[in-house]
UniProtKB/Swiss-Prot annotation:
SUPFAM superfamilies: (Trans)glycosidases (SSF51445). It catalyses: a thioglucoside + H2O = a sugar + a thiol; Hydrolysis of terminal, non-reducing beta-D-glucosyl residues with release of beta-D-glucose. The gene is TGG1. Degradation of glucosinolates (glucose residue linked by a thioglucoside bound to an amino acid derivative) to glucose, sulfate and any of the products: thiocyanates, isothiocyanates, nitriles, epithionitriles or oxazolidine-2-thiones. These toxic degradation products can deter insect herbivores. Seems to function in abscisic acid (ABA) and methyl jasmonate (MeJA) signaling in guard cells. Functionally redundant with TGG2. Hydrolyzes sinigrin and, with lower efficiency, p-nitrophenyl beta-D-glucoside. Disulfide bonds join C24-C449, C32-C445, C224-C232. This is Myrosinase 1. It comes from Arabidopsis thaliana (Mouse-ear cress). A beta-D-glucoside binds at Q57, H159, N204, Q205, Y348, E420, W468, E475, F476, F484. Homodimer. The active site is at E420. One of its GO terms (molecular function) is thioglucosidase activity.
Length: 541
């Protein structure tokens, strides 16, 4: 009988190993954490599996000029996080970058997405005012270290840390002067590092700075209408987000044009922006909610993808926003249209959308209201789409499937890299609890499972996946109250060891599973049950 049972288990494992037969679960309990059954072998050869970070969140402030997040978190420390945290020191990757590479090597990572700090390379914001040789040395060391370990660098030029001097001089992205300054900064980066960096990202999450930085005032530079937040030093939540978004697109396109004109033929690299994505589900079965869901997709994704693919904003945005939405000149439209070789897509959560036609007074109106939708974490029956992501939202692993398919079918089958996907845990947990982050394994493996599935079923052109994040770091607006890392950072002793969490050990095995790995891993906590495979998704409830 024992031999018969062993034979049955072996046959079950053998069948489940086949990528096209592995079942992806939409909700707990998850079984995808078994690296013997689901691993990098479910993806094509050469698929990049990496981790990600950004300069302000990991480098620390040593050796660079001030940026808008420095000023923002010091002027409004409570907005930097409930713990009043900021990026003054954080992980000190500026001096401890070799530790980062060692952790990535331990993870078996084949790629690393990081950003260059504009105010580190150009402390006074402009190339004409001087280049910092210390920054060149630092980034050369990091890039060379990655290449030596056969890790592919993906380098972001702007991850929200605008030099403060440019914000002071002309209000940063509110002014078209930013286009030339960003172009010059990008040109310098291509010149200095482009012989080794073959994957450039212009701007991280085009949606975020206009909305959180200029509509809500929750992010740097913290502008908004007075009645949205009395602490905002100035702003107009109805108009400024559209101006900033417009200038971001022009700056992005100018950088892409410089790369294609001066460097691409010799350096043989690629360049594109990063989009923050979400999947949206109807709040209920009404046509109004279904229509609101489509509007949410357009105002969230199409706001930027419309210009990038067609050289103009979506018609419904023009109808709803009116003259608050800027126009592209013919020359600008031609420059913006098609200004990407690939798209980086960040994906974390799914929301429900319901119709909201309420007209509010102009002094409390924000650009986020223009889609005439209300976004919620639960639907009309009180159901969430999946397990908790944080105190206010939930995740839905199949959402990544739908997002990838949506971008393929809506925006012309682009080359895609998943440039962020990750899960937070409380920042106040002790070492033992923080490193036993099994819920992060569930999050990562369930999303990777649906990513593999959509690539196979829909032939979506995805070539890489970067987990957020390499290690614990400063989290925008949350300080150190949350941890996203696959490795543990002790912020009371940042020079200490960077220990892999359970999620890091899982990712390590996922990337490079070996025959020596036990089938009955200690990570295998979820049972394989037909009941779980057959149960209805909460997203459909």
């Amino acid at each position: 009988m024992k031999l018969l049972m062993l034979a049955f288990v072996f046959l079950l494992a053998l069948a489940t190993c086949k990528g096209d037969e592995f079942v992806c679960e939409e909700n707990e309990p998850f079984t995808c954490n078994q690296t013997k059954l689901f691993n990098s072998g479910n993806f094509e050869k050469g698929f990049i599996f990496g981790v990600a970070s950004s300069a302000y969140q990991v480098e620390g402030g040593r050796g660079r000029g001030l940026n808008v997040w420095d000023s923002f978190t010091h002027r409004f420390p409570e907005k930097g996080g409930a713990d009043l945290g900021n990026g003054d020191t954080t992980c000190d990757s500026y001096t401890l970058w070799q530790k980062d590479i060692d952790v990535m090597d331990e993870l078996n990572s084949t790629g690393y997405r990081f950003s260059i700090a504009w105010s580190r390379l150009l402390p006074k914001g402009k190339r004409s005012r001087g280049v910092n040789p210390g920054a060149i040395k630092y980034y050369n060391g990091l890039i060379d270290g990655l290449v030596a370990k056969n890790m592919t660098p993906f380098v972001t030029l702007f991850h929200w840390d605008l030099p403060q001097t440019l914000q002071d001089e002309y209000n940063g992205f509110l002014n078209k002067t930013i286009v030339d300054d960003f172009k010059d900064y990008a040109d310098l980066c291509f010149e200095l590092f482009g012989d080794r960096v073959k994957n450039w990202i212009t701007i991280n999450q085009l949606y975020t700075v206009p909305t959180r930085g200029y509509a809500l005032g929750t992010d740097a530079p913290g502008r908004c209408s007075p009645k949205i937040d009395v602490r905002c030093p100035g702003g107009n939540s109805s108009t400024e987000p559209y101006i900033v978004a417009h200038n971001q697109l022009l700056a992005h396109a100018a950088a892409v044009d410089v790369y294609r004109t001066k460097y691409k033929d010799d350096q043989k690299g690629m360049i594109g922006p990063v989009m923050i994505t979400r999947w949206f589900l109807p709040f209920d079965h009404s046509q109004e909610s279904k229509d609101a869901t489509e509007r949410a997709k357009i105002f969230f994704h199409g706001w930027f993808m419309g210009p990038l693919t067609e050289g103009k904003y979506p018609d419904i945005m023009r109808e709803y926003v009116g003259d608050r939405l800027p126009e592209f000149s013919e020359t600008e439209a031609a420059l913006v249209k098609g200004s990407y070789d690939f798209l980086g897509l960040n994906y974390y959560v799914t929301q429900y959308a319901q119709n909201n036609q309420t007209i509010v007074p102009s002094d409390v109106h924000t650009a986020l209201m223009d889609s005439r939708t209300t976004l919620t974490s639960k639907n009309a029956t009180g159901h969430a789409p999946g397990p908790p992501f944080n105190a206010a939202s939930y995740y839905y692993p199949k959402g990544i499937y739908y997002v990838m398919d949506y971008f393929k079918t809506t925006y012309g089958d682009p080359l895609i890299y998943v440039t962020e996907n990750g899960f937070s845990t409380p920042g106040d947990e002790d070492f033992e609890k923080a490193t036993a982050d099994y819920k992060r394994i569930d999050y990562l493996c369930s999303h990777l499972c649906f990513l593999s599935k959509v690539i196979k079923e829909k032939n979506v052109n995805v070539k890489g996946y970067f987990a957020w994040s390499l290690g614990d770091n400063y989290e925008f607006c949350n300080g150190f109250t949350v941890r996203f890392g696959l490795s543990y950072v002790d912020f009371a002793n940042i020079t200490g060891d960077r220990d892999l969490k359970a999620s890091g050990k899982w990712f390590q095995k996922f990337i490079n599973v070996t025959d020596e790995d036990s089938t009955n891993q200690d990570l295998l906590r979820s049972s394989v049950s037909s009941k779980n495979r057959d149960r209805k998704s909460l997203a459909d409830a």
